[in-house]
Amino acid sequence: MKPVAALGLDIGRKRIGVAGCDGLGLLATALTTIQRTTLEADLAAIAHWIEQRHIQVLVVGLPYAMDGSLGKQAKQTQKFARKLAEAFGLPIEYVDERLTSVEAENQLKAEKQYDRQQKGLVDQRAAQIILQQWLETRQCASKP
């Protein structure tokens, strides 16, 4: 399996959780939370991470409804992801992100790092979970 530089994104209306992976493409790590303001500012903040980490692919969590359909938020996420692809010329890979925020909260609570006032930590951890799922799927697909 060839190493990949991927950036995981948990895109919400107010914040974007950001995660990166190690040089081998095996382990995802939470990086930061971007407070959304304008499209230009959001793109500039993401551009910083793309340049700093030499990103080759953007992995975006897609918030399917529990019945598997694409709701309003999922369509907004896809629209923003298309803007990312156009702005940076990078491929977009989608990951089903149902319940990743709940999983992120539970992990942070177990680590005694959860604070209701710091929702950005949940977004970062959700982005990490999204990216880790993608990395693991990629690893399984490359095995004979």
Curated annotation (Swiss-Prot):
GO terms for cellular component: cytosol. Its EC number is 3.1.-.-. It is found in: Cytoplasm. InterPro entries: RNaseH-like_sf, YqgF, YqgF/RNaseH-like_dom, YqgF/RNaseH-like_dom_sf. One of its GO terms (molecular function) is nuclease activity. Pfam families: RuvX. GO terms for biological process: rRNA 5'-end processing. Keywords: Cytoplasm, Hydrolase, Nuclease, Ribosome biogenesis. HAMAP family: Nuclease_YqgF (MF_00651). Could be a nuclease involved in processing of the 5'-end of pre-16S rRNA. Belongs to the YqgF nuclease family. This is Putative pre-16S rRNA nuclease. The lineage of its organism: Bacteria, Bacillati, Cyanobacteriota, Cyanophyceae, Oscillatoriophycideae.
